[in-house]
Amino acid sequence: MSRQSLTKAHAKITELSWEPTFATPATRFGTDYTFEKAPKKDPLKQIMRSYFPMEEEKDNRVYGAMDGAIRGNMFRQVQQRWLEWQKLFLSIIPFPEISAARAMPMAIDAVPNPEIHNGLAVQMIDEVRHSTIQMNLKKLYMNNYIDPAGFDMTEKAFANNYAGTIGRQFGEGFITGDAITAANIYLTVVAETAFTNTLFVAMPDEAAANGDYLLPTVFHSVQSDESRHISNGYSILLMALADERNRPLLERDLRYAWWNNHCVVDAAIGTFIEYGTKDRRKDRESYAEMWRRWIYDDYYRSYLIPLEKYGLTIPHDLVEEAWKRIVDKGYVHEVARFFATGWPVNYWRIDAMTDKDFEWFEHKYPGWYSKYGKWWEEYNRLAYPGRNKPIAFEEVGYQYPHRCWTCMVPALIREDMVVEKVDDQWRTYCSETCYWTDAVAFRGEYQGRPTPNMGRLTGFREWETLHHGKDLADIVSDLGYVRDDGKTLVGQPHLDLDDPKKLWTLDDVRGNTFQSPNVLLNEMSDAEREAHVAAYRAGKTVPA
């Protein structure tokens, strides 16, 4: 189709739009933004006639690669360490995709621009396609991998797991609160424009290095759609910028969206890339190096900073703090240690680090061994049942962390933890920005302006609170993380399946009572709480 005929077809579509003049339409998805002065253009002029043949070709390539992987015995070559982490990743990622599809009607309803409505409808179809091919990838892994346990329960496990629910919070951010905040700034302007770079470009590169060429095929197919989504987001952003009343809301939402994306995506993808790989070539990029290239240079410097010419205040301080957390404060390494601590309630197995891993981490992050090496040696020592408890219940110099109320990633950079009483409850936050998000941004008023559409961060947000005072064996059983024999745990702190005596069972973990740090915090006196928080921030090992 020529560009001229495409433009004519697009113009015809906009002629079919209808705006009633005799009544005010009912608002289905509310927003506090205003668009009376907004320009109404769609720079890409997206239409279905050119869209479907392109997507059909992409799907053919994806399913052809899946067939080729089976015929080519890919699963004899792929690293187990890598595929185990895919049990968690592929249980989470289809949910944000389908949430993004659900977000498109919110954006269509909130944005009075017939031109861009068609592009948003196309994006909705994209997101459904993405979720579908990711679910099919997960099914193929389950059917062909040596240990399907975990892959076969991901939809259930994702919703009740201490790690999966972090991803659920992330995806629900696309469809809750103010329609523009959720469906445009949080989803499109930040998540899709920035963090899909590490998610769908850097991570597939790591997959290929571990013998998995299916994930790169699927996720490059996904990423190739993102340019259109970025265009949709930028168009709506420019519409919002046309009205000065929207500027404070945009600046609020950029701070919230950037920080929550960093907290969740960097925690997950950084861990998958750095602790899920067996490729320890010294010239291989660390996650910090990937982040500097794909997020700092490609997004922050080329996309965010130019927005200053429109009068927006860009969250430079939060970008620099995110970089500092990754490079100087060990954010990804803390997340990996937290996931490994929780192995009994995982539905994936976490491989121990070896001397080769230690050497690579020390090369990329000088000082890594002095902070994390001893703990991973303890993880290796406590890998098998019979002589010890799971590592979370052994004295190894590690205190189980408090959960952040906002992003739901624990307060792992302990010196930065914030403790405040909000809505008559003592809450813990991983950072000042997460506290601000809960106490200031998600409220009915912002800087003296009513913001009734923002909503609140409510519900049972702390996984630990749901299981406070329960025996570990009962928690695992209630979650359903037990293999077909009715006793062996799905999660294991090693990859050795050959010897049944090395596999942990419900009996091996029974007798360990789980305590929620946040429940205990609310039960403390003021003096006890102050002492506990001070010790936590200082990194001292004290009872939760």
Question: Which residues make up each language-model segment?
Answer:
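Short cysteine/histidine-rich zinc-coordinating motifs and their immediately flanking basic loops
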Residues: 415-423, 441-448
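Zinc-coordinating Cys/His ligand positions in small cysteine/histidine-rich zinc-finger domains
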Residues: 412, 430-431
